[in-house]
Amino acid sequence: MERYENLFAQLKDRKEGAFVPFVTLGDPSVEQSLNIIDTLIEAGADALELGIPFSDPLADGPTIQEATLRAFAAGVTPTQCFEMLALIRQKHPTIPIGLLMYANLVFSKGIDEFYAQCEKVGVDSVLVADVPVEESAPFRQAALRYNVAPIFICPPNADDDLLRQIASYGRGYTYLLSRAGVTGAENRAALPLHHLVEKLQEYNAAPPLQGFGISSPEQVTGAIEAGAAGAISGSAIVKLIEKNVANPGQMLTELKAFVTAMKAATRA
């Protein structure tokens, strides 16, 4: 959790927002996935949001479902994902690493064992996408036991009660949803969410990062202008992986250019 605090403090000093890319671990293969993650970091990613392939990803649009299928086709297992996480942490000791998960993957290991393993490999946060705040107690309690930040999604229609709960239970950062629905770059992010950001700040929530449909530098700038601490981009990045599956070198070149442009927008 300290890695997030350190990151946001450093960014504040530099008057920058955070740019956080999302990819699925093991897409399109373990080896190329590790190359991709190195490239994202070299190009300026401030933190990582990583998915573990899961057979029924509810909140994911078609782009990220395809990423999951590619990882499955490469034979990637949750155990391998944790081995990858340990390697990433070894190589990049300071970058915050977050997991975006589904509850079944946590249950299959046992909640306590899952978070213990997260701590062991150096994961900083876990967002369990299909567990609402009111059912989150066993997850967030285990997370805090192992010094892992529980992340909560703040939807655009959140009422005051939900905002207070998110502020109270969340650590690390708050995942600010640009709009309701499934992920995807083709569903452009809606208007910036000034009122939510103000309320979250009033209740001392962890810094908000805006996600869902973030695919251009202008949207990153817009998120930061609305008061968000930064932006998360998933589908736009995964699309570049999909487009260049047959050409790994070109894939890394395009990913580097995209992340460089998105990170530059946090300094505007």
UniProtKB/Swiss-Prot annotation:
Q: In which pathway does it act?
A: Amino-acid biosynthesis; L-tryptophan biosynthesis; L-tryptophan from chorismate: step 5/5
Q: Which reaction does it catalyse?
A: (1S,2R)-1-C-(indol-3-yl)glycerol 3-phosphate + L-serine = D-glyceraldehyde 3-phosphate + L-tryptophan + H2O
The question of whether Lyase is a record keyword is answered with: yes
Q: Name one GO molecular function term.
A: tryptophan synthase activity
Q: List the disulfide bonds.
A: none
Aminoacyl-tRNA synthetase as a keyword of this entry, yes or no, is: no
Q: What is its EC number?
A: 4.2.1.20
Class of enzymatic activity (EC top level): lyase
Q: Where is the secretion signal located?
A: none
Parts of the chain that traverse the membrane: none
SUPFAM superfamilies to which the protein is assigned, alphabetical:
Ribulose-phoshate binding barrel
Q: Where is the active site?
A: E49, D60
According to the record's subunit comment, the protein's assembly and interactions are: Tetramer of two alpha and two beta chains.
**Which protein family is named in the record?**
Belongs to the TrpA family.
Name under which the protein is recorded? Tryptophan synthase alpha chain
Organism name: Citrobacter koseri (strain ATCC BAA-895 / CDC 4225-83 / SGSC4696)
Q: Corresponding gene?
A: trpA
